[in-house]
Amino acid sequence: MPLFAVMAAAAFSLPAQPPAATGANLTVAMDDARIVLLGQIDTTDARRPRLGYPGTGMILRLEGGALSLRLSSTTDTSALTVVIDHGAPALKMLRKGEQTLVLASGLDPGPHVAEVYKRTETWKGVVTLTSIELSAGGSLLSPVSLPARKLLFVGDSVTCGAGVDNNPKCNEEPAHPISDSYHSFGMDLGRRLDAQTHLVCYGGRGLDRDYRGLGVAEGVLNAPQLIDLSIPSDDPGSRATWDYRRWTPDAIVVSLGTNDFNLEGIRPLSEEKFVTDYAHFLKSLRAEYPGAFILTTEGAIVTDPRLRRYVQEAVAQTADARIAWVPAEHYPGNGCNAHPDAPQHLHMADDLEPVLRRVLGW
């Protein structure tokens, strides 16, 4: 398996800064070129990158017995996933405010690889990375080389991995959130296909309206607006924009419509508007990424045949041979949460893997 088949998202190497000694340990600023940042991440302040979308994070190589991460969280509901030396992913819950998170301890001299991914959605909190701390005698090694292949997944809470860790109690325990981006179908596909992976997703949002029926007119952002951001927020003062030139996907998988259809029995969608807006969104993706293959699907939750038809009509309206529709299987969660759970996310990846391999020649 390729060295970085376990990872996802994009990398941005930044100018190296000399590390500063702190007592017996070594502190390294986040703009050190040996720290590779992952995902649609906000680097407005290169020394304090911010993680909004799930799956954003960092990867680095080191020698030394211990590694810590200095960070701050806007809430006490954010969580990270930490992977050391391609081992089992570990859950790290965060508290609100500044903190030092031990990523690894008791390691042999190495070398080692450490990966950190934002586990939870943006609305659960934004995480700012401040610095890396290595134990005495430790050092960072040359930056990792990421896979050349790149995948972008655009969607809602399912794309984010909400429900992956559904538990038998049918509740979300504060110490163990049910969201897990690392085991989402998109991130899993990235590992299978040896590709960097971006997740641009937000729970409860759709193409034109969210699960409450709200859209831009009510100050609520949906996918066509979220795609432009690295920190998505309905509050204009809290947003950060994304520069499309920083990363170009080979393929884009769009899974939208579940939340648009949430109020279908009360406030039916206009088929004409939904189809036209969807086609316009697909064309806007094409304009930003001329070489990407774009796959659309209706998602794993809604079984209404109208949604499937609307998506197909939108694809046809683009008249683009490299924009296609693939049917979604229904994955109903575990009985107490409608979101697909971990085994079902694996099945979703199973469904899409042969399609992506075929259209991309991978």
Language-model features: locations:
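Generic structural signal for well-ordered alpha-helices
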Residues: 278-282, 311-312
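A structural motif corresponding to the C-terminal end of an alpha-helix
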Residues: 185-196, 284-293, 315-320
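Structural recognition of the beta-strand scaffold that forms the well-ordered cores
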Residues: 150-154, 159, 197-201, 250-255, ...
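Aromatic/hydrophobic pocket-lining residues that form the small-molecule binding cavity
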Residues: 274, 278, 345
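N-terminal secretory targeting modules
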Residues: 3, 8-154, 158-181
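Catalytic His-Asp segment of secreted/periplasmic serine-dependent ester chemistry enzymes
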Residues: 299-362
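Conserved SGNH/GDSL esterase-like catalytic core that processes O-acyl groups on lipids
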Residues: 53-55, 97, 119-126, 169-268, ...
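Conserved, well-ordered alpha-helix/loop/beta-strand core segments that scaffold catalytic motifs
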Residues: 253-257, 282-287, 293-296, 305
